[in-house]
Amino acid sequence: MMRTLITTHPLLLLLLLQQLLQPVQFQEVDTDFDSPEDKMEEFREYLEEFRRTGPTRPPTKEKVERRVIIEPGMPLYHRDYCNEEIMRKNVYHKQRCVTEHYFLLMQYDELEKICYNRFVPCKNGVRKCNRSKGLVEGVYCNLTEAFKIPRCKYKSFYRRGYVLITCAWQNEIHKLIPHTINDLVEPPKHRSFLNEDGVFVILP
């Protein structure tokens, strides 16, 4: 009879098996996260990005906010800041470590406003970046060991400077959103200020 059931109703049997296994899978995932509903969405997105073989999906507000924005807690000058935060926030590119990353101590809305500031040159051959008008505290992470997760090791650098970002248009919300944090430029240590043209003016 079992053989007849398998041969005549294979799809039904597969669906029943899937339903039986589903609670076990969710129970295992829930033990890793404190707030299941919010974290499950993040976990699904992470798995999708991890397994993706095509182009990386464009960033969303939620993804940028989760990966870049930080709140007061661990001292920003702590030497293991990047190692802990990158693991906690799942900052990876598919199965590889990111070579560099920035964490910013600011509100997402303030970061988004930078997209409408004037253009300035930025590093790594990128021609146009938007620069913050004020100084922002953050941490720069530079990969020092390994290239595949979970063995990524980073050196952490505390910075207080002007944020340079690139932005992209998001059709769903009809506005510019931050795309990439290009740099966090520390001002010269002598007395100076930025004029309206984005040039450092040194005071006598």
UniProtKB/Swiss-Prot annotation:
Keyword set, alphabetical order = Disulfide bond, Glycoprotein, Secreted, Signal
The record's CDD domains line, in alphabetical order, gives: RNase_A
Keyword Signal on this protein? yes
Query: Which cysteine pairs make disulfide bonds?
Result: C97-C152, C115-C167, C122-C129
Where primarily located?
Answer: secreted
Q: Name one GO biological process term.
A: defense response to Gram-positive bacterium
Gene Ontology molecular function, alphabetical: nucleic acid binding
Q: Name one GO cellular component term.
A: extracellular region
Q: Which domain of life is it from?
A: Eukaryota
Where does this one sit in the cell? Secreted
Residues carrying a glycan: N130, N142
Endpoints of the signal sequence: 1-26
Say which family it is in.
Belongs to the pancreatic ribonuclease family.
Q: What does this protein do?
A: Does not exhibit any ribonuclease activity.
State the protein's name: Inactive ribonuclease-like protein 9
Q: Which organism is it from?
A: Macaca mulatta
